Every structure is written in structure tokens, then in C-alpha cells.
Amino acid sequence: MPKQKTHRASAKRFKRTGNGGLKRSNAYTSHRFHGKTKKQRRQLRKASMVSASDMKRIKQMLSQMK
């Protein structure tokens, strides 16, 4: 049986945290900032956590990642 591989695109987008969560960066941060408030832009710089409903799918894609 072939080896199970890590989904490389997902591995570049998510980082594991110390207590088993997954950290991700926010969308809407590359252009069109004139329609966003200063507060929105500041909050989008911070990383977010992956929601519990998506966690199972993403952990499966990253199963071989340490």
C-alpha cells in the first residue's frame, strides 16, 4: 500500500499550535483596502484559529505533518 502523503498546499497555509489547534491567516488582506476601516485592516493582520467544524478535514490533510 502506498504511503500516505501530506497535502502540501494545506501544509503551507496552516501551523499547529501547542495545544493541538491550527492557526491560519485571514482572507481579504491582499488588495482593495480602501473599502475597509483602519480597525478591520489591523484585525486582519492577526492570525485566526481554524473553526471546530473544519478541524477534522484539515487535520486529515495534514496527518503526516509534525
UniProtKB/Swiss-Prot annotation:
In this chain, the stretch annotated as Disordered covers 1-52
The alphabetized UniProt keywords are: Ribonucleoprotein, Ribosomal protein
- Entries under PROSITE patterns matching the protein: RIBOSOMAL_L35 (PS00936)
- Keyword Ribonucleoprotein present in the record's keywords: the answer is yes
* A single GO cellular-component term on record: cytosolic large ribosomal subunit
Q: Which family does it belong to?
A: Belongs to the bacterial ribosomal protein bL35 family.
Q: List the source organism.
A: Ligilactobacillus salivarius (strain UCC118) (Lactobacillus salivarius)
User: What gene is it encoded by?
Assistant: rpmI
Q: Name one GO biological process term.
A: translation
One family name in Pfam for this protein: Ribosomal_L35p
- InterPro entries, sorted: Ribosomal_bL35 (IPR001706), Ribosomal_bL35-like (IPR021137), Ribosomal_bL35_CS (IPR018265), Ribosomal_bL35_sf (IPR037229)
Q: Which GO terms describe its molecular function?
A: structural constituent of ribosome
User: What is the designated name of this protein?
Assistant: Large ribosomal subunit protein bL35
Residue ranges, compositional bias (Basic residues):
1-16, 31-45
